[in-house]
């Protein structure tokens, strides 16, 4: 797969690579897979690619979306797709904070470090990522959406960022804290991760000559 997702996280644009004989009829394969996996999993497209294509390592960027429902009353139809927050959020403050994450940074303050493979594993994993876009939007009727695009994401990075943005939106910390958190590299200083159900792996970008 192009990206790994935690339990409860959704994926609209997940990409999967597989080695198949040339005789395979892709439209027929799609129908067969959808009959086996649906309705919670759906294959929306199947195409042939170059032999050296890799769903994860050929990708140039990934984008995620996180949805927040900021209303006094919960919406039963959004229980599994949004984080419901009752107290009013200051969207302007959240957007100011999101501007700070754009660019190349060490996101250790927002990443869960990989566990060592064994007691002899001393490899230091890099948490440097290049964020190309990060933006909050008000979609109306209390629905807020956060979109972020980067070359890659480390474990729980988006959920930790969203959790921190929400604390800023609730005036628990100022927008200027975001830059300081990035510089600190200290996971304990950032907010707990946001719930998984609001997050979607939305799209994965590849070079134009992949197929």
Language model segments and positions:
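Structured-RNA-binding interfaces characteristic of tRNA pseudouridine synthases
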Residues: 1-211
């Amino acid at each position: 797969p192009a990206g790994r997702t935690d339990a409860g996280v959704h994926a609209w644009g997940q990409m999967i690579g597989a080695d198949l004989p040339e005789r395979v009829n892709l439209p027929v394969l799609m129908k067969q897979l959808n009959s086996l996996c649906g309705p919670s999993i759906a294959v929306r497209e199947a195409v042939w690619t170059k032999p050296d294509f890799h769903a994860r390592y050929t990708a140039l960027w990934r984008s995620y979306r996180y949805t927040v429902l900021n209303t006094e009353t919960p919406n039963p139809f959004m229980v599994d797709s949004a984080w419901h927050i009752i107290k009013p959020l200051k969207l302007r403050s959240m957007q100011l904070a999101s501007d700070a994450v754009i660019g190349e940074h060490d996101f250790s303050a927002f990443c869960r470090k990989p566990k060592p493979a064994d007691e002899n594993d001393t490899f230091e994993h890099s948490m440097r990522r290049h964020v190309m876009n990060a933006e909050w939007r008000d979609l109306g009727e209390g629905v807020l959406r956060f979109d972020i695009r980067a070359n890659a994401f480390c474990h729980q990075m988006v959920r930790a960022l969203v959790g921190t943005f929400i604390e800023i939106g609730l005036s628990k910390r100022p927008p200027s804290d975001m830059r300081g958190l990035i510089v600190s590299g200290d996971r304990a200083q950032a907010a707990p991760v946001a719930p998984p159900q609001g997050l979607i792996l939305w799209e994965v970008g590849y070079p134009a000559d992949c197929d």
